[in-house]
Regions:
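Extracytoplasmic beta-strand/coil segments of soluble accessory domains associated
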Residues: 70-111
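A beta-strand signature from Gram-negative outer-membrane beta-barrel systems
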Residues: 124-165
Length: 679
């Protein structure tokens, strides 16, 4: 009981804040006022965006009892989410068949989750904090930087001017996970607004459903808080905020032996200032500044990894709308990162006796000017052409061109095309933190920062029928790498090799989406995606990227009764097969049969369901995840070679070869409390 006290205190503070909020509004009769809201189906393709953009709104984020940002993609076909390893609980995503490191993450158009915050950062953005998530495929605007290769994921938080001055959410999972979220907004004056966001979660029990002696999920405790502010007058708008994260997670063998102990601390502060230069708002200037500090300490058995990061990002933007048809945005941005890293693998007695590993410092600096021209003819045709001149310390100058076309030949048809270049500096260990959950030796320069270079192009056609709410969408996108860091598990069974790309590397992705409302209050989303992703591996040639599923299909159904008093959500997902590592081909299950005939994972289904009952001011919900109870067998490889807790880790030990669910069936229940503004 003592372990749950911090969460209980947070819940008490949340309810106290609700009372204070209600008193501060000075309403005459709050209970007599009814607020009618529209609960949308939860996700849709944006008609107005130039890029092919999927929007998951607040209703979509409520379809599951989760959730953080990673879990919100569980029922999405565009984004695949999985585990980086079976020990730390780190989540990773894939877009267009490629790792999430090639997808730029934004918080209200401000770059986030790069560097040390990336491996666990998807769990640091609670779903109840968000208004929506926008998933854009292809090459986005040059204004946000050169880093995007496969697309952008932008999150919109609840605003200081929110119509919901208080929101509280608490949920409990059958695996003992407790999750509490609070959002409280307040108008301090007609010009000054603020919102406070709080989150706490913890796992209190050990689970080993596959009986391999390892925790299926780490015991974790996370606290997360943000304070966001807005000052607004006609002459200027200022937004600023601060946030902090504390995350502790322990995994590995139960009762001792090989264990992981991860401690992550993060501080962030940002400032956004915007000023109109004309009364009609046709010209404006804005400045964005962001600072992040991360501290990551990880113990992997006897191995130790420590990382410290200081990051600064600044962007000066000028926009001028010359006429209704012509718009020009120019500016200059700068990004600076300093990393202090040390790594001691602890795989041999010599590693242990040599003492702490030396700290290696690296400073990454890049930036430059950019310009973006927009030409549009009403809603019929849009052209966006952008160019960045990016300078990288140690590498030199690069041009980053991008172009987007949107054409609406008829009211019911929208065509889009997009192409552009993306650049990013690789962070070998941070980008692939799962390599630390192995006993394999590292071969190559795993602390260098190679400049990765890729070109992405593609298009989308969306046909609307039987009104604005029904559509069929088809899209294709292709990414080609000119330079890439390859992390190769298969060159040698007991080593992981890091080396530059020595041939082709590409991903082709096809996707079809059908959204329909067959009858009132019933919506259906059917999505299918096929991916062909291959890379050249040293000594093996061009091969399919391992552990990356080639197919995913999702069917999402929702039905609401009148006045949305009852909401029923059901999602079925079919996950295609993936190529396994060569050293996994001969693995056998408990029945003696090969686990991966033909060297591929099985096709498996997953089911999710939730029932929500809405009352005045609060909702109750109960649901289930992974109702098929499908789990990956033999998640931890080589652990049977560990005869006692004192022996060193075998070289064949690998906890990073994860392609499917680790946890089985989960049941959840929760409550949402909402206080609306009344006038």
């Amino acid at each position: 009981m003592k372990k749950s006290r911090p969460l209980s205190v947070m819940a008490l503070l949340a309810l106290s804040a609700a009372v204070c909020q209600a008193q501060s509004e000075e309403r005459v009769d709050t209970l007599a006022t009814s607020v009618v809201t529209a609960y949308h189906s939860g996700g849709t393709l944006s008609r107005g965006q130039d890029l092919r953009t999927e929007i998951i709104n607040s209703a979509g984020l409520m379809k599951m009892a989760c959730c953080n940002l990673a879990e919100s993609f569980e029922n999405s076909a565009a984004v695949t989410v999985g585990y980086a390893d079976a020990a730390t609980g780190a989540r990773q995503i894939r877009l267009l068949g490629l790792s999430g490191i090639y997808t730029q993450m934004l918080d209200e158009s401000r770059p986030i989750l790069h560097g040390l915050s990336a491996p666990f950062g998807l769990s640091y953005i609670p779903g109840p904090w968000l208004e929506s998530i926008q998933i854009a495929k292809g090459s986005p605007s040059v204004v946000s930087g050169p880093d995007s290769m496969t697309g952008q994921i932008n999150v919109e938080h609840r605003k200081p001017t929110d119509e919901i001055p208080f929101f509280f959410n608490a949920s409990r999972m059958s695996d003992s996970r407790l999750d509490v979220n609070v959002a409280s907004s307040l108008a301090l004056s007609p010009s000054l607004y603020t919102i406070t966001l709080g989150h706490a979660e913890a796992n209190f029990k050990d689970h080993d459903m596959n009986m391999d002696g390892f925790l299926d999920e780490p015991r974790a405790r996370q606290f997360n808080v943000q304070s966001r502010w807005l000052y607004y007058i006609p002459e200027v708008q200022v937004r600023w905020g601060v946030g902090a994260v504390s995350d502790n997670r322990r995994g590995g063998q139960m009762g001792g032996g090989w264990q992981t102990d991860i401690k992550n601390r993060q501080l962030n502060a940002y400032l956004k200032v915007g000023r109109p230069l004309r009364e009609d708002q046709s010209a404006s200037v804005a400045w964005v500044a962001d600072y992040t500090h991360d501290r990551l300490d990880g113990a992997y058995g006897r191995g130790l990894y420590t990382g410290r990061q200081h990051s600064v990002f600044t962007n000066l933007i000028y926009r001028n709308q010359f006429s209704e048809a012509h718009d020009l945005t120019t500016g200059v941005s700068l990004s600076w990162d300093r990393y202090d890293e040390s790594l001691s693998r602890g795989l041999t007695l010599n590693d242990v006796l040599s003492g702490p590993a030396p700290v290696q410092r690296s400073e990454l600096l890049h930036g430059g000017p950019y310009g973006e021209y927009t030409f549009h003819v009403h809603h019929k045709f849009n052209l966006v052409a952008g160019l960045r001149g990016e300078w990288y310390r140690g590498t030199g100058f690069r041009l980053v061109p991008r172009i987007t076309l949107k054409f609406e030949p008829a009211e019911s048809l929208i065509l889009r095309a997009n192409a552009g270049r993306g650049l990013r500096e690789a962070l070998p260990l941070i980008d692939h933190l799962g390599v630390l959950s192995t006993g394999k030796y590292f071969d190559g320069d795993y602390l260098s920062h190679q400049l990765e270079d890729a070109w992405t192009w593609g298009g989308n056609a969306t046909w609307y029928f039987a009104g604005e709410t029904n559509y069929l969408s088809l899209d294709f996108f292709s990414t080609r790498f000119a330079d890439q860091l390859i992390v190769d598990y298969e060159q040698n069974p007991v080593t992981i090799a890091f080396y530059p790309l020595e041939g082709k590397s590409y991903s082709n992705s096809w996707q079809a989406d059908l959204h329909a409302e067959p009858f009132e209050r019933f919506t259906m989303d059917l999505t299918a995606r096929y991916t062909d992703a291959k890379s050249t591996f040293r000594g093996a040639g061009l091969r399919e990227i391992p552990l990356s599923p080639n197919l995913k299909g999702v069917l999402a159904l929702q039905y609401k009764t009148r006045l949305s008093r009852w909401i029923f959500d059901f999602t079925a997902a079919l996950n295609g097969s993936a190529r396994v590592y060569d050293f996994m081909k001969d693995l056998r299950g408990d029945d003696g049969q090969l686990l991966y005939p033909g060297g591929r994972t099985p096709v498996y289904p997953q089911l999710f369901a939730q029932v929500t009952r809405r009352f005045k001011g609060f909702d109750l919900y109960v649901g289930g995840e992974n109702l098929t109870n499908f789990r990956q067998e033999k998640v931890i490889l080589g652990f049977d070679q560990i005869s006692n807790p004192e022996q060193f880790l075998p070289q064949h030990f690998d906890a990073s070869a994860v392609w499917g669910p680790i946890m089985g069936l989960k049941i959840n229940a929760g409550i949402r409390v909402t206080i609306w503004k009344t006038y």
